[in-house]
A protein has these predicted regions:
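A short, small-residue-rich loop immediately preceding and capping a beta-strand
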Residues: 84-105, 109-118
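Solvent-exposed alpha-helices and their adjacent loops that cap or buttress functional pockets
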Residues: 7-9, 29-31, 82-84, 106, ...
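N-terminal loops that bind phosphate or other acidic moieties
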Residues: 308
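A glycine/threonine-rich phosphate-anchoring loop and its flanking beta-alpha core
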Residues: 13, 107-199
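Active-site segments that bind and position negatively charged phosphate/pyrophosphate groups
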Residues: 189-301
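ATP/NTP phosphate-donor binding region
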Residues: 1-89
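Single conserved hydrophobic/aromatic residue that forms the stacking wall/gate
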Residues: 313-323
């Protein structure tokens, strides 16, 4: 029985998903704002964001645009806070760090937040949580927000244009939901946490089956299931389970790796995936968990098949690779 009061931000107020979701979202965006700030970062998504800006203008809105210089970083957020004073909503279009920055900026300005993931690399478009990094890319902490985004637009035609590496990274990040929750929350008596753990198990099973086919064919049903599992379903578990279902060893390893300049080019999920392998080794060697050894043997071939890093080398020669 849950003895204490708890508050949950479980899901965005509205979710539009599928082919053409962005076009369908425009009337909803009109209802939320008239002068949105469109936030992005990567030069690789600049053309997509120019199109989104043109669509907003064609819909009668007056959009402003801004780019992050760093990851979700206080230096950027301070600058954007000043630049967005005339805006009445924040639209974050990009990867996880752009989405985190947009959510946190909207939270601090008390403005509506619209997330438009341009990859399936994380579930940041869904959650009421933002990770903060230093200008150098080192993880500094996370901030819990009072609500999930007001609107999440998951347009398959936009997400499909992302590099395959981002989907592989999203698979690793989503898989961590099970491997971490099964350690942190397996003995919880909280019904919501129990249900989040079981959802994480089902999600893991689906990704083990679907993700290789999804990587091979972006027009397949497996791609849709995998991309939505990574960007949407994984976020549901965070909303239901809260802190009890995240940040065990896999994400702790990620957070540590961000302190190393040599790891800054690795995507979030690539570091998390390596962290899962570390966690399973710790469970096996320090906890005597034979199931962890079996899970390691099951997971390692998949991560390799998806092209995810499975070894940590120290220059100039490798030492005790985890994989």
């Amino acid at each position: 029985m849950v003895q204490s009061f708890s508050s949950h931000a479980i899901a965005p107020a509205a979710v539009l998903r599928g082919e053409g979701a962005w076009s369908e979202a425009l009337p909803r965006i009109q209802a939320l704002c008239s002068k949105p700030l469109l936030l992005g970062r990567s030069s690789s998504t600049s053309q997509l964001r120019h199109k989104l800006t043109a669509d907003l203008s064609a819909a009668g809105l007056i959009p402003a645009s801004a780019d992050l210089e760093f990851d979700c970083c206080e230096r950027d957020l301070t600058r954007l806070h000043l630049e967005s004073q005339l805006c009445d909503a924040v639209i974050a279009a990009g990867g996880g760090k752009v989405l985190d920055a947009g959510k946190l900026l909207a939270h601090r300005l008390s403005l509506p937040c619209i997330t438009v993931p341009l990859s399936a690399a994380t579930c940041a478009g869904w959650t009421a949580l933002s990770n903060i990094y230093s200008p150098e890319g080192a993880f500094e902490g996370d901030v819990s927000l009072n609500r999930c985004p007001d609107l999440l637009v998951f347009d398959h035609s936009l997400v499909r244009q992302a590099p395959p590496r981002t989907l592989a990274s999203g698979v690793a990040d989503a898989l961590a939901k099970w491997y971490e929750a099964s350690v942190s929350s397996a003995d919880s008596s909280d019904g919501l946490v129990q249900q989040a753990v079981q959802m994480a198990r089902v999600l893991r099973d689906q990704l083990l089956i679907d993700s290789p086919a999804a990587m091979d064919d972006t027009n397949s049903a497996a791609w849709v299931r995998t991309a939505e599992a990574c960007a949407l379903t994984a976020g549901v578990m965070g909303g239901l389970g809260g802190a009890r279902c995240r940040t065990v060893a896999a994400h702790a390893v990620h957070n540590g790796l961000t302190q190393l300049p040599a790891c800054h080019d690795a995507l979030h999920g690539e570091k998390v995936g390596f962290g899962i392998l570390v966690q399973l080794r710790l469970e096996e060697r320090m906890g005597g968990n034979r199931l962890a050894a079996q899970a390691h043997r099951q997971l390692l071939p998949l991560l390799r098949q998806l092209g995810l890093p499975c070894l940590l080398y120290t220059s100039p020669s490798p030492r005790d690779p985890i994989g």
